[in-house]
A protein has these predicted regions:
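Glycine-centered tight beta-turn/hairpin loop motif at sheet-sheet or coil-to-beta transitions
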Residues: 10-12, 62
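Core catalytic lobe of class I
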Residues: 53-296, 339-344
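S-adenosyl-L-methionine
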Residues: 57-76, 304-333
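A short, exposed loop/beta-hairpin motif centered on an aromatic-Gly-Thr core
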Residues: 12-20
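Short aromatic-glycine-(Arg/Gly/Cys) micro-motifs in beta-strand/loop hairpins
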Residues: 1-10
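A contiguous, mid-protein "functional segment" used to position or interact
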Residues: 288-306, 310
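Short, mixed-charge low-complexity intrinsically disordered segments
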Residues: 35-56
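A short, charged, amphipathic alpha-helix used as a generic interaction element across diverse proteins
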Residues: 21-38
Length: 344
């Protein structure tokens, strides 16, 4: 982690002046100092102080939305804090020069260097490394959600099992508006998978069973979620190639956390996780290597601080709108426990 080290040197000298008042005396000395008629030097040295602090990309005024710029496999080793929940959308390793259809146009599916795959062994090692670091950042009763496709989800599942997690569910997100398959040689890709796992085999996790029934017309919530892909209004502040919709993240957060919870996203991108968290009265830390996407994240949070935008978002996200109508008190902020805040 990058740090800012502030060096404060205190120099002190007493000047004697003839003046009509104390205020006038101070003005005279200030003027002489501004003109460099008075220059303090080493003989005036009194003390020196060093103060070290983490270099943050952004921290909102309400302290509920924090961004770190850098590699999560490095940054997660640099601070001590336990989160209630983690959501991760790691690289899928599918940027191989292929093409797809987006808004009626043929587009390249290359996301960037961060999404280019290596050997199966290197992908497995990468997943074990970051998942192990995340495990150390979870409370004992905490849970982790990891999104993926067939390109990486099996590697992720193996890593979770090897590291001692208990897999609770594998959610199938069935997109109601997927892009078409233009090769016409196999079925259209219309799903993504989200593994939900708890840190410990023995320590119980939190699941908001009744709330999930409430948003599912009084029936048990199943592990197949019919939800749309990203909507244009969610990209007003900029585009991220793998941005998740608020409908998906809101359901995840509602299902597995309480108001006031701390949520981590180690591959935050444009921070849909953080926006959903703040819409629901939770707090958020996001980490990403790409400054371009952190700029989008910051813009989205600043946009959300507008009261009208905040209200508009709540009406557009299906589960939130339903709960707002039926149980508005659910979204009241709880008091944070004393000292329960990030260490930076």
């Amino acid at each position: 982690m990058e740090y800012q080290v502030t060096i404060t040197e205190i120099l002190s000298r007493t000047e004697r002046v003839e003046a009509s008042s104390a205020l006038m005396a101070e003005k005279m000395v200030r003027l002489r100092y501004a003109k460099e008629d008075i220059v303090l030097d080493y003989s005036d040295f009194k003390s020196v102080d060093f103060h070290t602090s983490e270099s943050l990309f952004f921290k909102s005024e309400d302290r509920a939305f924090t961004l770190l710029h850098g590699d999560s496999t490095r940054l997660l080793n640099e601070f001590d804090f336990k989160f209630d929940m983690i959501f991760a959308d790691p690289p899928y390793f599918l940027s191989n020069g292929g093409i797809s259809i987006q808004s009626g146009r043929v587009v390249c599916v290359d996301k960037g260097e961060w999404d280019r795959g290596g050997t199966p062994e290197s992908i497995d090692a990468f997943n074990r490394e970051w998942i192990s670091l995340c495990r150390n950042k979870l409370k004992d009763n905490g849970t982790i959600w990891i999104s993926g496709t067939y390109h990486n989800i099996f590697s992720v599942a193996n890593a979770l099992t090897e590291l001692g997690f208990k897999i609770l569910n594998v959610i199938t997100w069935a997109k109601t508006n997927p892009p078409p398959n233009i090769s016409c040689r196999y079925f259209t890709y219309s799903t993504e998978f989200i593994i939900w796992a708890r840190k410990s085999e023995k320590v119980p996790h939190f699941y908001n069973y009744d709330l999930m029934k409430q948003v599912n017309e009084g029936k048990q919530m199943r592990d197949v979620w019919q939800l749309p892909a990203i909507a244009p209004w969610e990209k007003r502040c900029g585009k991220h190639p793998t941005q998740k919709p608020l409908s998906v993240l809101s359901r995840i957060i509602l299902a597995s956390t309480k108001p006031g919870a701390w949520i981590l996203d180690p591959f935050t991108g444009s921070s849909t996780t953080g926006i959903a968290a703040n819409l629901l009265g939770r707090r958020f830390l996001g980490i990403d290597k790409e400054e371009e996407y952190l700029e989008i994240s910051r813009a989205r949070k600043l946009e959300l601080e507008d009261v009208r935008t905040f209200a508009s978002y709540r009406k557009k996200v299906k589960d939130i709108a339903l709960l707002d109508k039926d149980s508005p008190s659910l979204f009241a902020h709880e008091e944070a426990p004393p000292g329960y805040d990030l260490p930076f």
